[in-house]
From Swiss-Prot:
Stored Gene3D superfamilies: Divalent-metal-dependent TIM barrel enzymes
Subcellular location as annotated: Cytoplasm
Cellular component annotations (GO), alphabetically ordered: cytoplasm
Highest taxon of source: Bacteria
Record field: catalytic activity: alpha-D-xylose = alpha-D-xylulofuranose
Annotated keywords: Carbohydrate metabolism, Cytoplasm, Isomerase, Magnesium, Metal-binding, Xylose metabolism
Annotated protein name in UniProt: Xylose isomerase
Matching Pfam families: AP_endonuc_2 (PF01261)
Gene coding for it: xylA
Family classification: Belongs to the xylose isomerase family.
């Protein structure tokens, strides 16, 4: 069955095109710095938002009814989603997709039935993968939707829940490996607390670390060589989540000797909820060699929740790709569109248009960022700004030679201290120049 039969295959037509079903800036085969643009960006489709979302919210019923959800049997719907998904991947010519275990196959009455459902759908996906150019960027387990996870999964107060979550991740790891996934993601939506009055934070954090170490060991056991990723988010659905932001996760991984196994999967809207620019989260991850992958979306700064909008802000995408390029590009990671159409955008074509808009925005951002990096615009300014640490007393501070007594003696010899302007306005002007002239 053709679900998108009324929508033409999406091709690159250039910035002058008015065709809503064409790329304006994303030319997948355009060679930049020796490789195609598609290999720089490594776009992925999020299975959950794209094929499972219904448009429901806490105040209203579903507004989105997809043609692949027409069956009364949940497994029939799951099989239809697979067919629709691979048609969609081909329509946009995307290289990757991402999934939760419960996105692709429904939860059963017990773990055995859930695993049976998963095996059946995985077998079907494997058949499609044989002839598809699209691969799996990452897989994960949904450890937040079912009521059993009301108090968390790895951080649950109930050891039975911990055990069930471990079994679910075990299976999800096996499935991700079976499908050729390049990464495996942990997102702790229920790993946190609502109140400290009933919480043993120390035990919960220790148990979370134990859980992750078990995952690392099992991955070695089955020969899964994909990259483990943790996705920070400060809140929602839980009041306080332990993977609050990049710095929190980095500190946690360091404390529990997990940093050698994990990198970060950073989402735009999660950075917003943590009170950070996306640029900040990426910069922190990059300078600590923790930048693994990106969940590409954006939020509404006037709202206090995760809106998961398609990323259309070119300044945001430019600064994001600047950090990715400075990090040496993606290794096993990529740009996963963890984005959903608005509740009022319920037509099938809106799904396609949303992804085109996001892919164009990141393609444009990459091209601008590449030129900024190549020209050394910000690097030159930063080198000049911090040059006092390359000679004299500054060099001694950096080398570790300086101590308080030496620095006091030096400070006493100073007549006066002169600072120079940070030139923020100039740098923002230059950024705009590159954005508008590219």
């Amino acid at each position: 069955m053709k679900y998108f039969k009324d929508i033409p295959e999406v091709k690159y037509e250039g910035p002058q095109s008015d065709n809503p079903f064409a790329f304006k800036y994303y030319n997948p085969d355009e060679i930049i710095d020796g490789k195609p643009l598609k290999d720089h960006l490594r776009f992925a489709i999020a299975y959950w938002h794209t094929f499972c979302a219904t448009g429901s919210d806490p105040f209203g019923q579903p507004t989105i009814v997809r043609p692949w959800d027409k069956f009364s049997n949940r497994m029939d719907n799951a099989k239809a989603r697979v067919e629709a998904a691979f048609e969609f991947f081909e329509l946009l010519d995307v290289p990757f997709f991402c999934f939760h275990d419960r996105d692709i196959a429904p939860e059963g009455e017990n773990l055995k039935e859930s695993n049976k459902n998963l095996d059946e759908i995985v077998s079907l996906i494997k058949e499609y993968l044989k002839t598809s150019k699209t691969k799996v960027l990452w897989g994960t387990a949904n450890l937040f939707s079912h009521p059993r996870y009301v108090h968390g999964a790895a951080t649950s107060c109930n050891a039975d829940v911990f055990a069930y979550a471990a079994a679910q991740v075990k299976k999800a790891l096996e499935v991700t490996k079976e499908l050729g996934g390049e990464n495996y993601v942990f997102w702790g939506g229920r790993e946190g607390y609502e109140t400290l009055l009933n919480t043993d934070m120390g035990l919960e954090l220790d148990n979370l670390a134990r859980f992750l170490h078990m995952a690392v060991e099992y991955a070695k056991e089955i020969g899964f060589d994909g990259q483990f990723l943790i996705e920070p988010k400060p809140k929602e659905p839980t009041k306080h989540q332990y993977d609050f932001d990049s710095a929190h996760v980095y500190g946690f991984l360091k404390k529990y000797d997990l940093d050698k196994y994990f990198k970060l999967n950073i989402e735009v809207n999660h950075a917003t909820l943590a009170g950070h620019d996306f640029h900040h989260e990426l910069r922190f991850a990059r300078i600590n060699n923790m930048l693994g992958s990106i969940d590409a979306n954006m939020g509404d700064l006037l709202l206090g929740w995760d809106t998961d909008q398609f990323p259309t802000d070119v300044r945001l995408t430019t600064l994001a790709m600047y950090e990715v390029i400075k990090a040496g590009g993606f290794d096993k990671g990529g740009l996963n569109f963890d984005a959903k159409v608005r509740r009022g955008s319920f037509e099938l074509e809106d799904l396609v248009i949303g992804h085109i808009a996001g892919m164009d925005a990141f393609a444009k951002g990459f091209k601008i960022a590449y030129k900024l990096v190549k020209d050394g615009v910000f690097d030159k300014f930063i080198d000049e700004r911090y040059k006092s640490y390359k000679e004299g007393i500054g060099a001694k501070i950096v080398s570790g030679e300086a101590n308080f007594k030496m620095l006091e003696e030096y400070a006493l010899s100073l007549d006066k201290i002169e600072n120079k302007s940070g030139k923020q306005e100039l740098l923002e002007m230059i950024l705009n120049k590159y954005m508008f002239s590219e």
